Swiss-Prot record:
Family stated for the protein in its record: Belongs to the RNA polymerase alpha chain family.
Single GO MF descriptor: DNA binding
Protein name, per record: DNA-directed RNA polymerase subunit alpha
One Pfam family cited in the UniProt record for this chain: RNA_pol_A_bac
Role this protein plays: DNA-dependent RNA polymerase catalyzes the transcription of DNA into RNA using the four ribonucleoside triphosphates as substrates.
Superkingdom assignment: Bacteria
Gene: rpoA
CDD domains in the record: RNAP_alpha_NTD
Domain comment (free text): The N-terminal domain is essential for RNAP assembly and basal transcription, whereas the C-terminal domain is involved in interaction with transcriptional regulators and with upstream promoter elements.
Length: 328
């Protein structure tokens, strides 16, 4: 009897704690060991492989490197950069964009002041503090926003064609703020050695917890399906086919080179073929039946005997053996 693996029929959702950004999901029952297997895979993909939107760089008038200070602004450039990394976006497009701001003091520069020029994005944490400007301060800043996955260091955001004074920053694209899982024992009938995997997900609000686990599951499935549907590539098929054809060709060539005296034939048939200068199977199969019957002392009984021998070798009279470079 084939053992049927225990699998969950559906994913359970904890409705009591569910919200637009927080979700708890339960998968049960699972075979022992599968709680950690699935939990680890989901956690890694959720944190590193989901697409999101983040700031990739900035340009501030009068600032030419990231270790500068700005007159009339309490925070220095490194502090401003750290604050901008924390700004979370919900994007309406997959393309990169730039927005320009001009802020005059006194002012408290917040994430909500970052406005899309063509509605490409929405800032989610609008109250996030960016910088404090004194009464005579003025801040002109270009903010570059892009799409990506996981975490991308500043070095990778330094693309060609950027203006002088462009400051690339680390981008945290992942829309997942936190994800953890735990594994507990669960009962199925009289057995208590099955597992229950509990997955807790918190997003930044740009994607729902439900959509995030669905997308993560699809990413995993796309990779696992490569193994489930594994078969040799077309090139491997072609190579194997050519090899098989080469082997068949060589085997046939050797068979056609078989000497007539090595066949289990009567003395009469041997003598008839020898007198007709038919020395190999290749010589024999290149002849037609009518031609053989014209040879001296060669009758229908001998023809039947030869047919039986050729049938055993899967050969027949009247074959074209020129491609095997056989002497007919």
């Amino acid at each position: 009897m084939i053992y049927q693996m225990q699998m969950p029929e559906r994913i359970e959702v904890d409705e009591a704690t569910h919200s637009e950004s927080i979700g708890q999901f339960v998968a049960q029952p699972l075979e022992r060991g599968y709680g950690v297997t699935l939990g680890n895979a989901m956690r890694r993909v959720l944190l590193a492989s989901l697409p999101g939107t983040a700031i990739t760089g900035i340009k501030i008038d009068g600032v030419f490197h990231e270790f500068s200070t700005i007159d009339g602004v309490r925070e220095d450039v490194p502090e401003i950069v750290l604050n901008l990394k924390k700004v979370r976006f919900k994007s309406t497009t997959k393309r990169s964009c730039k927005t320009s701001l001009s802020i005059e003091g006194p002012a408290d520069f917040k994430a909500g002041d970052i406005v899309a020029q063509e509605g490409e994005f929405e800032v989610l944490n609008k109250d996030m503090h960016i910088a404090t400007l004194n009464g005579d301060a003025k801040l002109n800043i270009d903010i570059y926003i892009g799409r990506g996955r996981g975490y991308v260091p500043a070095e990778e955001n330094r693309g060609e064609g950027m203006p002088i004074g462009f400051i690339a920053i680390d981008s945290i694209f992942t829309p997942i703020k936190n994800v953890k899982f735990s594994v507990e024992n669960t009962r199925v009938g009289q057995r208590t050695d099955y597992e229950k995997m509990i997955l807790d997900v918190e997003t930044d609000g740009s994607i729902s917890p439900d959509d995030s686990i669905s997308l993560a599951g699809k990413v995993i499935n796309e990779h696992v399906s490569l193994f489930a549907n594994f078969s040799p590539t077309e090139e491997e098929f072609a190579e194997e086919e050519y090899k098989q054809q080469d082997d068949e060709f060589e085997n046939m060539r050797k068979l056609l080179q078989t000497r007539i005296e090595d066949l289990d034939l009567s003395v009469r048939s041997h003598n008839c073929l020898r007198l007709a200068e038919i020395d190999t199977l290749g010589d024999l199969v290149s002849r037609k039946e009518d031609e053989l019957l014209t040879y001296k002392n060669f009758g229908k009984k001998s023809l039947t005997e030869l047919k039986e021998q050729l049938d055993k070798c899967e050969l027949k009279f009247g074959m074209d053996i020129t491609k095997y470079q056989m002497k007919s």
